[in-house]
Amino acid sequence: MKGIIGRKLGMTTIYEDGKALGVTVIKAGPCTVVQKKTAAGGEYNAIQLGFEELSPERAKKLLTKPILKKFEAAKVKPHRILKEIRVENPDEYNVGDVIDAGIFKEGELVDVTGWTKGRGFTGAMKRWNFGGGEVTHGSKFHRELGSVGNHTEPAKIWKGKKMPGRYGNERVTVLNVKVVKVDAENGLIAIHGAVPGARGGLVIIRAAKRPRK
């Protein structure tokens, strides 16, 4: 396993063998290794990566004291984002190492995790794709929920009932997407298809956990 943190820049078109491919361009890294975890130490094999380096003044405003102490102990400059990524062999990394987009190669399959666009408070039709009521003369409801349960028994609404509420801003992972282009010099990775989230949203790219055969 290997991975990197980045920001979604947007989508564009790349032509490959005469075919037009819609790709998402991601500004990946540079990320700094802040901590190593090993199974031998009673934990699991993983590394913690810092992304988007901060000045000391900005770090004091944006980070909590425990996080600042963590960077001080590792002798690494403070970073805005701190994420953990599972790896097979943590001994391949050292605290302070810098990881860039060059860890991935063109044609490789990856899993991309992002946070979907927040849509705010929405109704059941938009949130859960309900059909709604009849749009005819005499109908008393059109975009409402309908029945939500029985009357006397159980005389309550069951937990988990699909109802209006906040929609979006959820962590979503897209599996087995192809790396089309890698520009390690500029820290750019072009991934086939769409990636969850808005432009400028945080994404985590990992080597595919269950690649297609």
Curated annotation (Swiss-Prot):
Keywords: Ribonucleoprotein, Ribosomal protein, RNA-binding, rRNA-binding
Protein name, UniProt field: Large ribosomal subunit protein uL3
Membership in a protein family: Belongs to the universal ribosomal protein uL3 family.
BP-aspect Gene Ontology terms: translation
InterPro entries, alphabetized: Ribosomal_uL3, Ribosomal_uL3_bac/org-type, Ribosomal_uL3_CS, Transl_B-barrel_sf
One Gene Ontology term of the molecular function aspect: rRNA binding
Assembly: Part of the 50S ribosomal subunit. Forms a cluster with proteins L14 and L19.
Domain of life: Bacteria
Function: One of the primary rRNA binding proteins, it binds directly near the 3'-end of the 23S rRNA, where it nucleates assembly of the 50S subunit.
A Gene Ontology term for the protein's cellular component: cytosolic large ribosomal subunit
Pfam family membership, one: Ribosomal_L3
